[in-house]
């Protein structure tokens, strides 16, 4: 199966150098993954999956201080030999931002940190993978619904905004700066883009 799998990252050469971890698990490293938004995982056509089996495609950002956190992206099979997966919403943006100061003063300059990602393919029963694969339609619907609610709320609150000089004393009213609502809106939208189901937790 080693030569049967490939990965394409936009603007880069095709990668087929999967490492075999076990009889049914294969792993490949994606260097400089910070700016990668989508990956294509495909069968090269040299060896098909056994009947009834498919390749579950998993994604992980390796962390030296924690065990791997694998996330199922979807699957490929003999009848669906390639798939495009969006990984940008899976990135640990907060951790990347927090680590950006670690490379200061190397050779007298600030150098960007290079992060790697890993993609694993696990040979599993196709029926099981079909049931586990997240529905992009549902995720997209949640995202659109959440975004509309947030936009509606922000527009509603903004319609009542006044400057401090326009305010009249109202001891029974509580005022919230519009900038605070804007910050909340920005954070909520970012979290919604990363994971449309984050609000369920």
Swiss-Prot record:
Cystines in this chain: none
Protein name listed in UniProt: Protein OPI10 homolog
One Pfam match: Hikeshi-like_N
Signal peptide (residue range): none
Similarity comment text for this entry: Belongs to the OPI10 family.
Alphabetical GO biological process terms: protein import into nucleus
InterPro entries per the UniProt record, alphabetical: Hikeshi-like_C, Hikeshi-like_N, OPI10
Molecular function as annotated in GO: Hsp70 protein binding; nuclear import signal receptor activity
CC terms in the record's Gene Ontology section: cytosol; nucleus
